[in-house]
């Protein structure tokens, strides 16, 4: 008999060799019906996996991220099977699950069209209805290569040949289709209830522009049609809110072919950016942070010392200065560490909180670039805190509360993930355990719910990630808290303790916005360009009905500017309805309309973007109203 520990801590005994699917049935027939995959001792596996030793077990459903992943991974295989049935000459490349669904890359001597996608989708529905079992099998290297050669799958042969010696080579078979794959997958094609093919794109083999251009088909999959319909509605809404479209319409930013991935901020975009950064500075000053600034370019040796060279070299830009090798920083932490090292520190100085709005550069593949969301140059709102081990819990709690304050201001709900040690980590087991427990205890102490994301920590320490949920249900990973014992060791950081001896500080890396540019992109989509008054680039649009009101309009404009209200005037010889419609398209919070009545009464006719016509009020009353709205940062 073997002992199986369930997620809730309950221990059950079973015969050795029992399949996970059978355990799911014994736990609950309802769970068995919903089960898609499982985790055994933290590793995601198929439900058909047999258990031969004591293990911890978590049954995964579509509510779990890895459950979704398994279902959508199978969706990619179903797509490939459908394409091969309809177009046997097509060659298969790769087909993974991704955050929002899946894709598969194909080599074909024709171009896929939207009409062909409809035909493929119909074939997918047939395959789902046929309910083929997914059967995993393994082959020795030579047999695996021969199998793929027989099928004329050159890309699969290349993948197998590139696998390290001794690597397990596994395949999945479903009906008449077999694919090279490590898995895991759901038990049968019938589990994938609803599939939709979404779009077509080009993609270089292995992401290398020197390789052949393939055709990529994107799709998504759900266990219920209602969930798929909801997702498709969200996509339609997302198109309307696309920050690239709104950024152009509202004249906030642009991206040019002279600098792909390097955004240009226009005056209105800079207003939003400066407000966000100034608010950030104010709140950090209140919370005891001191702001620093470090150079963009630093000697290559620094990046070797920090470990970024080994883990991040492919994403870095390099230059040569005075015959020396330098790198443009992809992260702010090594520069911040040099600031810490510049002075001797006492335990009385700790915790030391150093903040930086630092510009970083990271090389992203051109195909991955996406407006402000994925760029090559961005401002990271970093802070690095140095503390004793005894101060970890209190400092982490303080950071969590600060992050919570920021996100609530913008109306975001969010969830928290604790990410643990990855495979390519550095440091001792003991340090990782202390660091992970420190983050866990901080979250537990304030009753903050969180998920555990095994193996997704930074290479130097575990982390807490904050995922924002926007108004149409999408999630965005922004804030992060990373506990680090490794950098202080690598850079020989120290402080003088109460005993007069040198001690090693603990370092925490953290961000709130994550990337200022990306956060602005998220806000554009969150508000659909209709920013709250305190954040709007133009807060008031002032317009006259005829030239007779021009002098009064200029007086009103001057009064608004004296009160630091951002105002634009529209004195064009156009109908007032046209001016109002244009201001509404520009999503200005307030329009002040001035006609003869308003001039005579010394008032302004107020129209709100949100509430429509508010009637005529005195200018003083309006100024008081909008100033209060700005002060309290009404969302």
Curated annotation (Swiss-Prot):
It catalyses: tRNA(Thr) + L-threonine + ATP = L-threonyl-tRNA(Thr) + AMP + diphosphate + H(+). Binds 1 zinc ion per subunit. It is found in: Cytoplasm. One of its GO terms (biological process) is threonyl-tRNA aminoacylation. Its main location: cytoplasm. Residues 1-61 form the TGS domain. Residues 242-532 are annotated as: Catalytic. Its EC number is 6.1.1.3. GO terms for cellular component: cytoplasm. Gene3D superfamilies: 3.10.20.30, 3.30.54.20, Anticodon-binding domain, Bira Bifunctional Protein, Domain 2, Threonyl-trna Synthetase, Chain A, domain 2. Pfam families: HGTP_anticodon (PF03129), TGS (PF02824), tRNA-synt_2b (PF00587), tRNA_SAD (PF07973). Zn(2+) binds at residues 333, 384, 509. Its cofactor is Zn(2+). InterPro entries: aa-tRNA-synt_IIb, aa-tRNA-synth_II, aa-tRNA-synth_II/BPL/LPL, Anticodon-bd, Anticodon-bd_dom_sf, Beta-grasp_dom_sf, TGS, TGS-like. Catalyzes the attachment of threonine to tRNA(Thr) in a two-step reaction: L-threonine is first activated by ATP to form Thr-AMP and then transferred to the acceptor end of tRNA(Thr). Also edits incorrectly charged L-seryl-tRNA(Thr). Homodimer. This is Threonine--tRNA ligase. It comes from Clostridium botulinum (strain 657 / Type Ba4).
